[in-house]
Amino acid sequence: TLGYIECLIDYLTDLRDADVNEITKDVWKIEKLDIQVKQDLIRPRKTISFTGISQPELKEEIKKAVYFQLRIESLETVKKELTAIRRFSRYLNEHKKNVKSCADFDRTIIEEYLVYMKTEDTGTKRYRSEITRLRSILNIVADIYQYPQAKDLILNRDIPPNIRSEFKVYSDAELKRFNEFLAKVDIQTARVMTIHQMLGTRISDTLTLRTDCLMEQNGEILIRIYQMKTHYYEKPISQELAALIREAIRYTEERYGKCKYIFTNENDHTKPMTYSLIQGRITTAIYRENLRDDNGKYF
């Protein structure tokens, strides 16, 4: 598309002016890149690693593709593409030692790799996602380096249909036990989990709620929820949930002053609480309180 071409031209211009020392390294420090990297605030990353790509020429091609991708995609998406290319690189190193660059790729190599992925224990449980990500980054390399022979080598028919995941459903007794358990963790962690349940959102959406998220409109209380990829949306909430959110805001402001996020990072008040912190607190408490589901397994 025209937008993609314009982005590619801008990328090549930025690449010319970039910090050459950083983008030639095998491990990039995100803070040293001269572009704004979009990433999940509750799962922050500090580096991007290209180690594990065995072929030097391929590694350099992938670096340029990643530098381009970081302009338009989230860091999490790019890291998943890197996982796919590292796995492909290992296969090439073991079975196609003469292949050094994307310029050497052809349909036969891809077909043989797809068979290998289906028949060998490659360590991935998400075949469809892996192939989709591999296609994405290989096509970008083909565009940047003008390798027409390497473009669209992975076909639509190579990618199996998406299979919907089954969500775990908790019984009323399990939910009752879990909610009783929340009374035994620290108050702000309990509020995170309760608000998360009542909103019915992803945990990342709850952890990035802002202190100005509540508003009134036509007699209703609305909450504004920010998402990394879709900016924000608003939805009505109950008086009870609004009261709980206000308590969480008051707790934060009494301890840390005015903050951007309700559940602020205690070490950096410009950022939200991290997912790993919440996960660690809840997991520790689950084992301490011996909290189990109806089948006797830990929650």
Regions found by a protein language model. Give the residues of each.
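Short, charged phosphate-coordinating catalytic segments
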Residues: 145, 195-217
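Charge-rich, intrinsically disordered N-terminal extensions
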Residues: 1-154, 181-184, 194-195
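Active-site-adjacent "gating/activation" loops or surface patches in catalytic cores
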Residues: 150-175, 256-259, 269-298
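Short helix-capping and inter-helix turn/linker motifs at the boundaries of alpha-helical repeat units
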Residues: 56-57, 104, 168-169, 182-186, ...
